[in-house]
Amino acid sequence: MKNYKIIVFGTVQGVGFRYTTKAIADNMGIKGIVRNQSDGTVYIEAQGNSLLLSQFISSIKAPKNPFAKVTKIDVSEIPVKTYNDFSVTY
């Protein structure tokens, strides 16, 4: 089990990116959170096995959302936490 902090750059706020990310996570069984940050990026904590997390990151790089445009993703490993689901936070 791994837990990643993911910062997503690009046109990712005000375009439904967090809800698209939640749908991807729910479909894959990934737990964690997603929220907008004041600098225009989106912050994600995603927890699951290594293979699923790799697939999750690939999926959010090219979201099935015509309004979102991801230009960069920074990923770092953080300590494992307890999540009940994947949720959009504010």
From Swiss-Prot:
Active-site annotation: R18, N36
A GO MF label: acylphosphatase activity
EC numbers on record: 3.6.1.7
Catalytic activity: an acyl phosphate + H2O = a carboxylate + phosphate + H(+)
Cited Pfam families: Acylphosphatase (PF00708)
Keyword Hydrolase applies: yes
Keywords: Hydrolase
Family, similarity comment: Belongs to the acylphosphatase family.
Gene giving rise to this polypeptide: acyP
Sequence ranges assigned to domain Acylphosphatase-like in this UniProt record: 3-90
Protein name: Acylphosphatase
Protein's organism: Ligilactobacillus salivarius (strain UCC118)
